[in-house]
Amino acid sequence: MGKRASETLAASYIKEYGLNVKLCRPAYIYGASSLTDDRVWAQFIANVVKKENILLKSNGAANRSFCYVTDTASAMLCVLLSGENGFPYNIAYEKSNTTIRGFAKTACEAFPERNIMLSFQNSEDEAEPQILKTPLSTEPEILDSTRLKALGWKPSVTLSEGIKRAVKVLEEQNR
């Protein structure tokens, strides 16, 4: 079931049965997953764990909101305890908004001693993509967490720090 459909169903239950429902819209949640996870961010983290170069299969221009798993959990608790019934709260750390390319670069830069390089499957993707901002352009994958922060939530894990934590956990699990 889609996210919006779930929210509509929740709104119906609030109206029909008076249920107390809190709604969260999380960004891309990242953290220590598994080394075989096929999500792109998880593949980049696995590359760092395995000390392998990162290969992008596109120009990596897609913009995303990311939020480390512990920040996401604390945000959900904040919404549960202080959020308005039936009101959706976006969970994102604006300082972690980046492109897929940016996530890959951050993963490489988080461990400079490993000399992990970023490469591209297609040479035409190597040039830094131009991301045009126009009044008509929208970025549905970028979330605004202003309402959540108004409840007192404060994210604390930067993208680089989150990648370092995830790598550390995976290395400990795979010894």
Predicted regions and their residues:
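Short-chain dehydrogenase/reductase
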Residues: 1-7, 38-42, 65-66, 97, ...
